[in-house]
Regions:
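N-terminal secretory signal peptides that target proteins for export/translocation
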Residues: 1-3
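Bacterial N-terminal signal peptides
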Residues: 6-16
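Bacterial Sec-dependent signal peptides at the C-terminal "C-region" and cleavage site
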Residues: 14-24
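Extreme N-terminal flexible tails
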Residues: 22-151
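Glycine/proline-rich low-complexity spacer/linker segments in large multi-domain proteins
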Residues: 106-113, 165-184, 233
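Extended acidic/polar, glycine-enriched regions
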Residues: 139-179
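Active-site-adjacent mobile loop/cap segments within catalytic or ligand-binding domains
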Residues: 162, 317-318, 353-412
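Active-site/substrate-binding loop(s) of hydrolase catalytic cores
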Residues: 182-201, 205-345, 365, 370-379
Length: 412
C-alpha cells in the first residue's frame, strides 16, 4: 500500500512528539543500608525529583536518645549509584532536622547556625578516586544542599572519611604479623562482635609500665581510628624513639571500643538507646564491664582516649596533668598547618569517692594514679594521612613529656 509522503512525514512527527513528551528518566539512586551507612535504611531517604533526593541522618528504626535522637545525629554516609554511562548531575538535601529535636535532646549549641556551621561540608570519593575530597554545601536552615556531577558507578559520600569495623579487623590482622604484637580478645559487644586489644612491646625481660590506648568510643569519630593506626604503625617501626618506647612500656591498644555503633552507623552510643563508653557504667552494657575490667587488670601508668569532635579549628587536649601538659605542648604545639589550636582543659580535682558520672580516664587517675588524657582531632582541613601522622606525633610527644626532664645545666 502506498502512503503519501506528507502523511508519512506527519507520522514521524507524531512519534517524535510522543517520545519528547515522555518524562526523562535518569539512572540515579541513593544506596544506604551498607556497613556504617546513615541513614540506616531507605526509609530515611525521600526522592523529590528525577535527580533530587532528601536524606534524614537522624532516621532510626527505633527512637533513640542523645545523638541517636531526631535532630541530634552525628553520622552521615551514603552512596549515589549512577547506572548510566555518562556523568549525571544530582542534588541531595541533607536534612539534619535541628528544630525537631526533643527539648531534652536539643543539641548543645548556641544556635542552629552554629550547629550547621559544622555540617557545611561532606567528603566525596568517586569510583576511580584514590582519596576523599572535601565538597562544601549551601546551608538553608538545617538543610545542607549538595550539588555535584556523579560519574558512572558508585560515588560514596560521608560527613567525614569513614573507618568501618571491617577496616579495623583487617588492620589488626595485618599488624598482628609483627613479632612485637600480640592480639587478645577481651570481650564481645552486645551484638557479638569481638573487642580485640593489641599488646605491643619488645621481648626484653625487664618490667614494663602499662599504657592503655583506645579509639572509637563514639561511633562517628573515625579520626580516632586513623590516629590509632598512626600510633601503632610508629610503635612497630624502627624509629629510635619507638624502639625506646616499646622497651619501657607494654602498649595495650583497643582500636575499636564500640564496634556495634560503628557497624550500625550510629553517632555516639552503642545502640539507639545504648551506652556512652566515655563513662564508667553510664547504662547497662557489657562493654562497660569490658573496659573497666581491662583497666583494673592493667592498672595503666598512661591512658589515652582518642576522639574527634565537631569544631573545625580547635583540637582538644583534655585532662592531662599540668606538668606533663606543659612539656607536651612544647613537643606538639598548635597544629597551625591544619588551622588548629589547642583547647586545654586541665584535670578535675580527684575525689576519694566516685562521682555519679566518671570518665574511664578519671577512674584510672583516681584508682591507680594514671596519667590520663583525652584528645580531640577534628577532621576539617585534614586528610586521612594527616590524621595518621597526627596520631604518631601525639604519642611521640606524649611519651617525651612523660619522661623526667633533665636538670638544668646537666646536659652533656
Amino acid at each position: 500500500m502506498h502512503v503519501p509522503l506528507h502523511l508519512a512525514a506527519l507520522g514521524l512527527l507524531l512519534v517524535a512528539g510522543a517520545a519528547a513528551a515522555e518524562p526523562e528518566i535518569r539512572p540515579l539512586r541513593i544506596e544506604v543500608g551498607f556497613e556504617g551507612s546513615c541513614p540506616h535504611s531507605p526509609q530515611g531517604v525521600k526522592q523529590e525529583g528525577p535527580a533530587v533526593f532528601r536524606l534524614f541522618p537522624s532516621w532510626r528504626a527505633s527512637p533513640g536518645i542523645s545523638e541517636e535522637s531526631v535532630g541530634r545525629s552525628t553520622r552521615l554516609g551514603f552512596k549515589v549509584i549512577n547506572e548510566g554511562r555518562a556523568a549525571e548531575p544530582i542534588e541531595v538535601l541533607i536534612d539534619w532536622q535541628y528544630d525537631e529535636a526533643p527539648p531534652k535532646d536539643r543539641p548543645n549549641f548556641s544556635s542552629r547556625a552554629e550547629y550547621m556551621s559544622y555540617r557545611d561540608f561532606v567528603v566525596v570519593r568517586g569510583p576511580l578516586d584514590a582519596s576523599w575530597r572535601t565538597t562544601m554545601l549551601d546551608i538553608e536552615g538545617s538543610v545542607g544542599r549538595l550539588r555535584i556531577q556523579v560519574p558512572a558507578g558508585a560515588t560514596e559520600i560521608h560527613w567525614h572519611p569513614p573507618y568501618t569495623f571491617t577496616d579495623c579487623e583487617r588492620f589488626v590482622d595485618r599488624v598482628a604479623r609483627d613479632p612485637r604484637v600480640r592480639v587478645e580478645v577481651i570481650g564481645q559487644s552486645e551484638e557479638g562482635r569481638p573487642i580485640r586489644m593489641l599488646k605491643i612491646t619488645d621481648h626484653s625481660g625487664r618490667p614494663k609500665k602499662a599504657a592503655l590506648i583506645r579509639a572509637r568510643v563514639h561511633a562517628y569519630e573515625s579520626a580516632g581510628s586513623y590516629a590509632v593506626e598512626g600510633m601503632v604503625r610508629w610503635l612497630v617501626s624502627d624509629d629510635a624513639y619507638a624502639l625506646a618506647a616499646v622497651h619501657e612500656y607494654a602498649f595495650h591498644v583497643i582500636p575499636m571500643a564500640n564496634p556495634d555503633g560503628v557497624f550500625n552507623g550510629l553517632g555516639r552510643l552503642t545502640a539507639p538507646r545504648g551506652a556512652d563508653l566515655t563513662f564508667v557504667g553510664s547504662r547497662p552494657d557489657r562493654l562497660h564491664d569490658v573496659m573497666k575490667q581491662t583497666a583494673d587488670r592493667l592498672r595503666p601508668a598512661l591512658f589515652v582516649d582518642l576522639h574527634n569532635w565537631q569544631s573545625k579549628q580547635i583540637d582538644g587536649l583534655l585532662g592531662l596533668n599540668v606538668d606533663v601538659r606543659e612539656r607536651f605542648t612544647r613537643f606538639m604545639p598548635d597544629q597551625v598547618q591544619f588551622g588548629k589550636q589547642w583547647f586545654i582543659r586541665d584535670p578535675y580535682p580527684t575525689v576519694a569517692r566516685p562521682p555519679n558520672e566518671e570518665t574511664l580516664g578519671a577512674y584510672c587517675r583516681r584508682c591507680y594514679g594514671t596519667v590520663a588524657v583525652g584528645f580531640e582531632f577534628p577532621w576539617f582541613g585534614r586528610t586521612v594521612d594527616d590524621v595518621r601522622a597526627t596520631g604518631r606525633t601525639t604519642l611521640w610527644a606524649l611519651l617525651r613529656a612523660m619522661e623526667t626532664p633533665p636538670a638544668v645545666g646537666k646536659s652533656r
